[in-house]
Regions:
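C-terminal non-catalytic regions of proteins with extracellular/luminal or membrane-system context
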Residues: 1, 6, 11-212
Length: 212
């Protein structure tokens, strides 16, 4: 038996001419507006944000390429495309510029991990090559660190206090391998990346692409 609900979709709106308007230009603009209103500025020391026009950025973290658009299950709907943080910044080339060396490094690393069969959101933070770090610092004095987290219907953020509570969700077990103290905290690899970037750059911004 196949599960069919095509005739029972009260959330499939129709336009005045009877055509579906889901994913229309109007809906895309509405989604963009909702995303903007859902962003929260947690801290802005020395008024580093917003970036001045012409700012050069060295973007660090696998989250620059591994964009989390929603949680697992019904929260992660099928879409025609997504825009990663890296691609989004590049689309603003009239305003900021991104160091291409790091962009290529993270995009390739994330792509390679998924080709090896890594589950969504379970990619591991790669170590930044010393030579690449040196070139990025020569490019700019401003770094942008990206961190992402994925959650789903059967599991959510965990901490070291949750180690004794096991979920039946397979992804929960995968998460324990990647995030040593639970994914409320930085993994060891993420912590090393953050400390490395902080030591090399005088100006650092952190972007959290997280759910839960």
């Amino acid at each position: 038996m196949k599960w069919q609900r095509v005739k029972y979709q009260p959330n499939t709106p129709l336009g005045a001419n009877g055509q579906k308007v889901t994913a229309s230009k109007a809906h895309t603009e509405l989604s963009k507006q909702a995303a903007k209103e859902g962003m929260v500025l947690l801290k802005n020391e020395n008024s580093l944000l917003p970036f001045e026009k012409g700012t050069r950025l060295a973007v660090f973290g696998k989250a620059s390429a591994d964009y989390v658009k929603g949680g697992g299950g019904s929260g992660d709907v099928t879409v025609s495309y997504t825009v990663s943080l890296d691609a989004g910044l590049k689309a603003l080339s009239d305003y900021v510029s991104v160091y291409e060396g790091l962009s290529s490094f993270y995009n390739k690393n994330v792509r390679d991990q998924y080709e090896r069969g890594v589950a969504p959101g379970m990619t591991v933070e790669p170590e930044v090559p010393a030579e690449l770090l040196k070139k990025a610092r020569a490019y700019t004095d401003t770094a942008l660190i990206t961190i992402c987290r994925f959650s789903g219907e059967g599991w959510d953020r965990t901490s070291s206090y949750d180690n004794g509570v096991e979920s039946g969700e397979p992804m929960w077990k995968e998460s324990q391998k990647v995030f040593e103290r639970g994914d409320f905290y930085l993994s060891d690899a993420e912590q090393r990346m953050v400390e490395t970037v902080k030591a090399a750059f005088p100006k650092v911004v952190v972007v959290l692409n997280v759910g839960g």
